[in-house]
């Protein structure tokens, strides 16, 4: 059964393409079944559930371990499926060597050389199925904002018919969004899509994302569950999480559905990424698309965000598991 607003949910593969990630609850969700074949099979199972539920947008990245490979395997095995929008990202490399205890899991490089190499790698796996290629986690110091040759190369990809987007992370997301959306190549905007972190605890990107929507740019939000802080089973005791838990209990819905419903009710109409790693999570996230939060709940939630610097500092301390 498809949910009413399933088309506004996308499936992100950050937590499926590699054995370790910084989202909480992975030991409960995955146990020890983390081999390449375990995760390949699980990815296909979750993709099947997402597609059956009406999800038509899938988001991968070069740094998400073998996510592009797993997605390509699934697409090749489902030749009947032609209506999936496929997005991926370049700018980080996965260096975790499929280990849970790797000291470093990914390395950032926003250079022309990295773009050229990673686009070649992505196309080797996804071929013509690639619809959107995003700069991964742009910050104010990203060379993308100043390197004319790199901008020109991205513009060439845009002119070939592949959408060019960016994702943002960190406490200065609004400034990065505005700077990126001001970029033009050959007289046309470079970016047609922006993906940013937005959730009940980190809302600072909201105004800039609203401006992006007004400019005709597609808006996608990630980490709507704050890497597990706003998911069922959370052990987070911060004021914002406690308030969200109380309101979810009042509405008799799970915390993840509250988080999704709040995101979907933003006036700039984002697409919301689910980071589901189980079919049960897919079903719960889709159920969240049918929930309309009462005005008093939306008002109470609006005042619970943390200072961006504090939010991102806490996120940087999360352990990969």
Which residues does each predicted region cover?
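Structural motif corresponding to the early beta-alpha repeats
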Residues: 81-112
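Short acidic/His/Gly/Ser-rich catalytic and metal-binding motifs that mark active-site loops
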Residues: 17-23, 94-99, 229-231
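N-terminal binding-site loop/beta-alpha segment at the start of enzyme catalytic domains
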Residues: 1-85, 89
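Active-site mouth loops of central-metabolism enzymes
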Residues: 21-41, 100-116, 142
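Active-site groove signature of glycoside hydrolases
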Residues: 121-143
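Beta/alpha (TIM)-barrel catalytic core signal, keyed to glycine-rich beta->alpha loops juxtaposed to Asp/Glu
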Residues: 137-321
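Short, well-ordered coil/turn segments that N-cap beta-strands
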Residues: 5-9, 54-57, 80-84, 127-131, ...
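Short, acidic/polar
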Residues: 35-49, 108-125, 172-184
